Amino acid sequence: MTVGKSSKMLQHIDYRMRCILQDGRIFIGTFKAFDKHMNLILCDCDEFRKIKPKNSKQAEREEKRVLGLVLLRGENLVSMTVEGPPPKDTGIARVPLAGAAGGPGIGRAAGRGIPAGVPMPQAPAGLAGPVRGVGGPSQQVMTPQGRGTVAAAAAAATASIAGAPTQYPPGRGGPPPPMGRGAPPPGMMGPPPGMRPPMGPPMGIPPGRGTPMGMPPPGMRPPPPGMRGPPPPGLRPPRP
């Protein structure tokens, strides 16, 4: 359908139209759309029909029904007439135009989080968390490091939590070696891995002379007062 032939129909868009059907019903609604088969779309439509009385003495009565949005088939349409002008609010844009002046309100997104410039709220006294650096690893240990220092950082964190001795700064050497547990002399094999080395003689006693008189060997409890301890190695106990 060309626009020239339907220009008269386009001029009646948004008008209140009265449509009469073949069965005598009347539809009055706002004319919104049509096609080449004269199928119509009416909104806010009302139906009016005449009901014949059972008794010939009574007059015909008209019944009204509110239908709303209606799709009317063109094959049932007999005539269309203008019932009234378009509503006044038809030309009002539902969406604000680009150059239209705005009102007093300001459209903005819903607030999420804390806006910039607002001071952070402080916890009440007694409810705050531990002070930074107390109750956990130090700030130096928690600082991100390279891949090669992950193991060193983990060891330092374990030592700081377990209360190990103070760490020595790099370049000044480590802690002194323990006394009495040096490397084995040349020509002798050390203890296998996982075993403690044998206890050496106490400091101040030359090797090879055993324990002094009156002192029990390592690992034995001293005798009670008034009793003599066991004889040193290499000496026989006196006969009674």
Swiss-Prot record:
GO terms for molecular function: RNA binding. The modification Omega-N-methylarginine is found at R108, R112, R147, R172. It comes from the Eukaryota. Its main location: cytoplasm. Pfam families: LSM. Core component of the spliceosomal U1, U2, U4 and U5 small nuclear ribonucleoproteins (snRNPs), the building blocks of the spliceosome. Most spliceosomal snRNPs contain a common set of Sm proteins, SNRPB, SNRPD1, SNRPD2, SNRPD3, SNRPE, SNRPF and SNRPG that assemble in a heptameric protein ring on the Sm site of the small nuclear RNA to form the core snRNP. Component of the U1 snRNP. The U1 snRNP is composed of the U1 snRNA and the 7 core Sm proteins SNRPB, SNRPD1, SNRPD2, SNRPD3, SNRPE, SNRPF and SNRPG, and at least three U1 snRNP-specific proteins SNRNP70/U1-70K, SNRPA/U1-A and SNRPC/U1-C. The lineage of its organism: Eukaryota, Metazoa, Chordata, Craniata, Vertebrata. This is Small nuclear ribonucleoprotein-associated protein B'.
